[in-house]
Structure formats: C-alpha cells, structure tokens
Amino acid sequence: MDIKKLESYAELIVRVGANIQKGQDVVISAELDQPEFVEMLVEQCYLAGAAEVRVEWTHQPLRLKHVKYQTVERLGEIKDWEKQKLLHRAETLPAMIYIESADPSGLDGLDQEKWGKSVQMRWKVIKPIRDSMENKYQWVIAAAPGKAWAKKVFPELGEAEAVEKLWEAILYTSRAEGDGVKAWQEHNADLKSRCEYLNSLGLRKLHYKSANGTDFTVGLIPQAQFLAGAEDTLGTNVRFNPNIPSEEVFTSPMKGQAEGIVYSTRPLSYRGTMIENFSIRFENGKVTEVKAQKGEDALKTLVNMDEGSKMLGECALVPFDSPIRNSGIMFYNTLFDENAACHLALGDGFANCIKDFENYTLEQCREMGINSSMIHEDFMIGSEDLNITGETESGERVQIFKNGNWAF
C-alpha cells in the first residue's frame, strides 16, 4: 500500500476522528501486528499538538493463555496500580484511539463462562470510573488489516495480496481516499439532515419487519434524539468522529420496551468468537431466547453478562444502499459490518441521546430510560426488504425505511 495514502489515513484518524487538541495526552490501543501504522499515528498525534502519546499493545494468543491458566479470581482482580491508572485517565481525559486488526476467530476456544465471570468482577471497579468520564473525552475506533483478518475476508488470495486488498477496502469505506476531510464534512452534513427530520417527527415506537422472520417493535424515549457522525465533548465542545467509517443514524431506545423477534443478517465476532445465523427474541423489553447455528454459547454469555445486557442500548438505521454493503465484502468486523446494515445493540445506551443531556446527570439520563450495562454489542438485522415504520405520540404512522433504504 502506498505510504502517502496510509499517512493521509493516519492524519484523518487523528484530526477528524479523535481531533487531538494541543497539549492533550493520547492513548493508542492496537494489536502487535500493526507497528508501522501505529508509528504513523504517533507521529500524526505529535504533529497535531499532542503532549504525550502512549501505546497499549494487545495480542489475542496471550489472552487465550491468561484465561486458560489463571483462576477466575485472579482474572477478575484489578490491582491497585490498574485502578490508579484508570483514575488518572479519568482525571486527565486523554484522547483514545483504538485500531482494530485482530483475527475475527482469534479467540475461538476461549472459556466464555470463565472470561465472562472475570469481566463481571472487574466491572464493579471499572464502572464508576468510566461513568465519571462519560462524554468528556474524544475517542475513535478505526481499522488496519491484520494478516489473519485479511485472509478471513479474502481466503482465495495469498497473505500479502489479501492484506493489500483489505487496505483498499478500509480506505474506500472510510472515505479516506482523496480529500478525506472534505468528504467527511459532506457526509456529516447529510447525516445531520436525516437526524433533523427524524427528530422532528416525535417518534415513540419503531416497528421492524422483513421476510426472514424479523417482526419486532421497540419503544423510544420521549426526551431522546437521533444522532449521527460527529459528536461534541461535554464542557469543552471538541468535535470528533468516534467511528471511522460510520453510516448510521442512531438513538438509544427506552429500556424495557421491546417485543418480538429479530434475525441476524451478518455474522457477529464477539470477543474473537464468531456467532452466525442467530435470532434473539424479546418479551417485556428483555431477551428471553437466543438461538445460533454457530457460537450459541458465546451469544448466551453475552446476554447474561448483567441485567442490562438483556436489554437494548441502541437502534441504528443504515441504508442497504451503503458504501460498505455495496463493496460486496463481508468484513467479519462489527465496525464495518454494522455500517452495512441496520442494527441493534444489546447493553449500554448513550446518555448523549437525551436532548440537552449536558443539563442532566448520568443517573438522571438512566432514569429517563437509557440502559446501563458493562457491554455494548451491535448485531446486524438489516436486509434489502426490511421495512421500518415509526409511530408518533399521536398514533400517526410514518414510513422510515422501505425495502431496506430510507423512505425519505
């Protein structure tokens, strides 16, 4: 891949994604297989004015070893130095850059029950610290092709060719070719106009129906709003784009208001385990049944992480006619696949989906209906025949999606 293109992509992530501010600290999280691209990111952060850039490396084989050999008690323990690091992060609010490149199946064989219990134990310490940081700092998730990931996406190609092909797909779908800054400005303007229309309707419910069996209704929070694209930090008003790429218009639904069944239309890679061809049934707002042809144990672990993991935290609208879907590529990565189809998310909701959320505490946003959970996992339900009908407070029905695409 042309070095200049990768440098431009790194600059896009830093300046349009995280929007690093002069004098701000930055933390980059990446897999061990990305030293060259991370080096580019570090340089771009400093060129943007960062005071210090730290890199935290991850490696799937090590996680497999840790979970296999450590006790659940040791896995779930947060040492004092770890807690102090988290508290320091909450105080200094560094910008966070996450680079995804891991093998979608790289954690197959992981003891899901053991890992899930350890995460639940750690969450008791992490949650109050994370809550104190809510909406106060910039973050962005972007991607770079790992070798195993590239071979998963393009199994018919050799390793080097697969990596090159995946780089091309990432740059195209991320609007990183040519003038990326201008492309994102235009894209955000389009997303904003759709949010404004949806917010003007006063929707209280969304009903989803498609030929694969999806027949599902979700309630919306009266004080909530649809958001998309760029966000602003609380207090400092720094604009950033948390997902590169992003095609979604989303909101957080009313906790505990969901009825019916939804069928997945794309695989889900959950913590390195593939979950495929699955369905989720909701009654009285909570998951009551899950089925999957592959990865059902992982799916059951997901929905039983805590009370909030059985409920929804997000409803996202993505047209079937989108750049990622039109690429014809199955990425086996939620960052991309969620932007190829309408999706829902189990778990934590977004406080900034409440109108004027800056005037409320996080707890007040929860009381209005924003779900709380240690997880937030997107799964795709969009199809070319998906119809979504909105219902307003007065009972008026409005067509939102028709045959997989915007109806307006």
Give the residues covered by each predicted segment.
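Short conserved micro-motifs at the rims of enzyme active sites and ligand-binding pockets
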Residues: G109, K152-F154, M274, L302, ...
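Short linear motifs in exposed loops
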Residues: G219, V290-K291, F401
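Extended hydrophobic packing segments that form well-structured cores
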Residues: E363-F408
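Long, well-ordered mid-to-C-terminal structural blocks that present hydrophobic/aromatic surfaces
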Residues: T251-E307
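Active-site lining segments that contact anionic ligands and/or coordinate catalytic metals
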Residues: Q257-E259, I275-N277, N284-V287, K310-E314, ...
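Active-site bordering "gate/hinge" segments
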Residues: M1-E259, G390, E396, W406-F408
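Short solvent-exposed loop/turn micro-motifs enriched in small/polar/acidic residues
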Residues: E11, N199-L201, R271-T273, G308, ...
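Dual-mode signal for accessory low-complexity, basic/Gly-rich regions
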Residues: E289-E358
